[in-house]
Amino acid sequence: MGTIPNARDLPAGSTNVPVVFVHDAAIDEFISSMLLSVMPGIDLLGLIVINADCISDPALEASSRLLQFIGRSDIPVALSRARGWNAFPWPYRGDCVSFNNLPILAQYKPQVATPPPDGEQLLTTLLQQAIEKAAPLTLLMTGPMTPLIDVLVHDTSLAKGVGRILWMGGAIDVAGNLDPSTTNPAVANTHAEWNAFWDPFSVHDVFKEFAGIHMFPLDISNSAPVSSEFIASLKQQGQSFRYSQLAYEAYSLVTGEPFYRLWDVTATCWLGRPDLYAPARAMPLTIEQWGFEQGWIHKPLVQGSKNSQNIYFKFADLAGFYQYVLTLLATNGS
């Protein structure tokens, strides 16, 4: 499967970057969906929801409501069949319920089939189309990596349809985010990050098959809190722009969680403004698949034994990052 091409390697004449967003429906991922819909040069082809840091039914309902809110009900939404090894704590997974119940979305009736569309089938179809059109996809993945591996296990040739992978996951030089108060201390090691811990085996397989993944670990997202200044700016903009008002109401749901960060928005905004990020550091990585340190991503003990990935450790312009988010949300849509 080999090295993933950079943006400059995408087919000549491409005006928009085809993006598939694979996520697990936390607050930050709903905002990322909005950002992708207004980000210049992005063609959002599909949303695939993983039943990981969410609850599937309200997550799909919220996705449907959000797409109606932004006038993009044409974007397909599907539910992945992925199953994790270590389940997210229930207290984390309820944010999608709160988002689904926001008053600003109440006027929109969810349009979700029963059973919902199959996420792996949607990803397979989009990869096949990408190969036929010679227009590889950018996969923005802000949850576990399981759906990609589940698709490739059935047809490895579909990897040709992957142009780039952006992944919010891991913790390299900082502590992980397994909290012993919500995760049994018998497994709550200090190194693992939840998107890796949920299914460390899929991370291992993706690292083995692909090089050049653009990774946004906790190292960078830790520096992007949902600050009071950011909330105040959204509130002010919300007086004129409904996208900002929705983001304000959504992030207000988590202001009581001091650990909350713009984890997924950090990865998402790189697509539009890579200049806001310090250059990535290329380094080989491995992940612990078993034992107490399960989910820990680190440099391999044997050099030269693993593919090299592109790790973003910090912003070049953190203030510019926040301003970019605010600028994108200063809209009422088309």
Segments (PLM) and residue ranges:
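Metal-dependent C-N hydrolase catalytic cores
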Residues: 2-6, 10-17, 60-131, 302-316, ...
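Active-site histidine-anchored catalytic micro-motif
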Residues: 2-65, 109-215, 221
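Short N-terminal amphipathic alpha-helices
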Residues: 45-46, 74-79, 285
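Short, mixed-charge aromatic SLiMs
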Residues: 54-58, 86, 171-175, 286-303
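Short, well-ordered secondary-structure micro-motifs
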Residues: 88-90, 176-178, 226-228
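Short, surface-exposed amphipathic charged segments that create phosphate/polyanion-binding patches used
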Residues: 91-98, 179-183, 231
